[in-house]
Curated annotation (Swiss-Prot):
Cofactor note: Binds 1 zinc ion.
SMART domains, per database record: SprT
Localization in the cell: Cytoplasm
GO biological process, one term: response to stress
Catalytic residues identified in the record: 68
The protein, known as: Protein SprT-like
Organism in which the protein naturally occurs: Listeria welshimeri serovar 6b (strain ATCC 35897 / DSM 20650 / CCUG 15529 / CIP 8149 / NCTC 11857 / SLCC 5334 / V8)
A Pfam cross-reference name: Zn_ribbon_SprT
Gene Ontology cellular component list: cytoplasm
Record family assignment: Belongs to the SprT family.
Keyword set, alphabetical order: Cytoplasm, Metal-binding, Zinc
Protein residues bound to Zn(2+): 67, 71
Principal cellular location given in the protein's record: cytoplasm
Length: 155
């Protein structure tokens, strides 16, 4: 999906679920890490996280759009637009939008090392030169076995 398509979808979702126009910009922001979208109070623009579209699909992404549009329309109407406000929670239920986003699993490369002397093995996120370090248990020489990818929750 491109910026133009995102803008068009945002306008369509706004008309379909809120019966109101979306008159500002909707843009992708790949720097967003732990949130699906963000409503900007000063400019009234909405930033969306493209990773949620890739990981969870268009249906879930439309849910995030509805959530951000709840912030947008309530703020412009000078009603309670924050998560804790009653107006916001009621509008979320009315349009069937999620209150919070699911977390995107993070991909981490782990490097596996083993001691040639005692056989102890361990995982590290950072690679290091095995010639410069020794085993902490027995002082033996270390050997890199390889690396593997692990998926974890964002913090």
């Amino acid at each position: 999906m491109k910026q133009i398509e995102l803008q068009r979808h945002m306008e369509e979702v706004s008309l379909q679920f809120f019966q109101k126009e979306f008159r500002h910009r909707a843009v992708f922001n790949a720097r967003l890490r732990t949130t699906g979208g963000r409503y900007l109070l000063k400019s009234h623009d909405i930033e969306m996280n493209p990773k949620y579209l890739e990981n969870f699909g268009l249906e879930y992404f439309f849910g995030i759009m509805k959530h951000e549009l709840c912030h947008y329309h309530l703020h412009l109407e000078k009603k309670g637009y924050q998560h804790r406000d009653k107006d916001f929670r009621e509008l979320l239920k009315k349009v069937n939008a999620p209150r919070f986003c699911a977390t995107i699993p993070r991909e981490i490369t782990m490097h596996e090392y083993t001691c040639e002397n005692c056989g102890k093995s361990f995982l590290k996120q950072r690679r290091f030169n095995v010639n410069r370090y020794r085993c902490g248990s027995c002082g033996g020489k270390l050997k890199q076995l390889g690396s593997k990818k692990i998926y974890t929750e964002n913090r």
